[in-house]
Structure formats: structure tokens, C-alpha cells
């Protein structure tokens, strides 16, 4: 979801978009780690516009990943990084977007991901990855004239000054390791 390009809202929020995503991960060792599936919210936008067709963009993802093979003393003792079947999924990426045509965009960049259970189970070293990103996006409703329009510095209408308050509540839990005398930990 995003605002129509070249509108005041698009200029004010600098090409921001958001949505829901699904990702499948294969780490090459399904017996030890599993092949997790992530469900996440994403938000991204334009950092810099180099021409009507080329821009530098960012995107972040936040969600949950499922179907891990967690550590187990007997069944999976080699897995020393993931201790639970469900873990948080965080991702950030930076990429160049090139509008190839009215329908297709090519995206090339770098991405970093982190999987962790936040110390709710041991072990919890977490798993970090850094990858290259290559993608092809299909645009459902881009107008033909949008690529021909030159990009201009955003003209944001005056914003009335005001104070707003947010109330945020959250909860958490964790496991805490305690070594006892005579233990091997």
C-alpha cells in the first residue's frame, strides 16, 4: 500500500509504502535448523531520487518466523544457536530501484536479517545473515505518465504545530541462566 506518486501525500512521506510479507528460508541444514517461514509487516521508502526512474530506497521487516528445529539435548544437540520453534524476525535492506517499464522495477541491494527468541528459551545466540538482494517488482496500477514526470523536491504544505501523546504498553519474559556450585555451566 502506498500513496499515489507525485501527490502531496507521497511527497510528504517520501514514497513510503507498507504491507504484509511472507518469506521462506533455507540455511542448507534443515535437519539441524529447519526451513523457517517468516510472516512480517514491512515498511519502506525512498531515501534519494537520482532520476525519474532510479532511486535509493530502504525497507525494514518485523515479524515472526516458524518451523525452526530448536536445540534439544538428545534429538538436536548440534544446534547451539536457536532454542525455540518460533522466533522474532527482523530485517533491514537498502537497494537501488530502477523503473524498467510502466509495469516492472528492478531492485538491487543488500539486506541484513536477525532471528532471535529474545532469551525466552536457551540457547539463544540468534542467527544473523547478510545477503545480496535482487528483485523484480510488478506494478499493478502505475500510470504511463508517472515515469515521464520529473522528480522535484517535496513541497510539503504547512503543518499546524501541536502536541500529541502516545501511551505504549508492553510485556516480556526471559529465561535467566544461573550457574550452581559443581555445575558445568
Locate predicted features:
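Residues that define the transmembrane beta-barrel architecture of outer-membrane proteins
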Residues: 1, 14, 33-39, 84-90, ...
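Short glycine/proline- and aromatic-enriched beta-strand/turn motifs that initiate or cap beta-hairpins
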Residues: 1-4, 131-133, 137-141, 147-184
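Transmembrane beta-strands of outer-membrane beta-barrel pores
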Residues: 3, 22-28, 62-70, 112-116, ...
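Gram-negative (and chloroplast) outer-membrane scaffold detector with strong preference
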Residues: 6, 13-66, 185
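Repeated loop/turn-to-beta-strand initiation elements of outer-membrane beta-barrel proteins
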Residues: 6-9, 98-106, 142-146
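Outer-envelope beta-barrel architecture signal
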Residues: 12-18, 52-58, 102-106, 128-132, ...
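Membrane-embedded beta-strand positions of outer-membrane beta-barrel proteins
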Residues: 18-20, 58-62, 94, 108-110, ...
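Extracellular loop and loop/strand-boundary signature of outer-membrane beta-barrel proteins
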Residues: 27-30, 76-82, 117-124, 177-183
Amino acid at each position: 500500500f502506498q500513496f499515489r506518486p507525485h501527490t502531496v501525500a507521497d511527497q510528504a512521506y517520501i514514497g513510503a509504502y507498507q504491507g504484509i510479507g511472507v518469506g521462506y528460508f533455507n540455511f542448507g541444514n534443515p535437519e539441524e535448523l529447519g526451513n523457517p517461514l517468516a510472516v512480517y509487516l514491512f515498511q519502506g521508502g525512498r531515501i534519494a531520487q537520482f532520476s525519474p526512474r532510479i532511486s535509493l530506497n530502504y525497507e525494514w521487516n518485523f515479524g515472526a518466523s516458524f518451523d525452526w528445529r530448536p536445540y534439544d539435548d538428545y534429538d538436536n544437540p548440534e544446534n547451539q544457536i536457536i532454542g525455540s520453534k518460533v522466533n522474532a524476525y527482523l530485517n533491514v535492506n537498502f537497494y537501488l530501484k530502477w523503473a524498467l517499464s510502466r509495469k516492472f522495477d528492478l531492485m538491487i541491494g543488500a539486506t541484513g536479517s536477525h532471528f532471535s527468541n529474545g532469551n525466552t528459551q536457551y540457547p539463544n545466540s540468534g542467527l544473523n545473515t547478510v545477503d545480496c538482494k535482487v528483485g523484480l517488482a510488478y506494478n499493478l496500477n502505475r500510470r504511463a505518465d508517472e515515469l515521464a514526470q520529473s522528480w522535484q523536491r517535496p513541497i510539503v504544505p504547512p503543518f499546524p504545530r501541536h502536541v500529541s501523546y502516545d501511551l505504549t504498553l508492553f510485556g516480556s519474559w526471559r529465561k535467566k541462566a544461573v550457574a550452581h556450585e559443581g555445575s558445568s555451566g
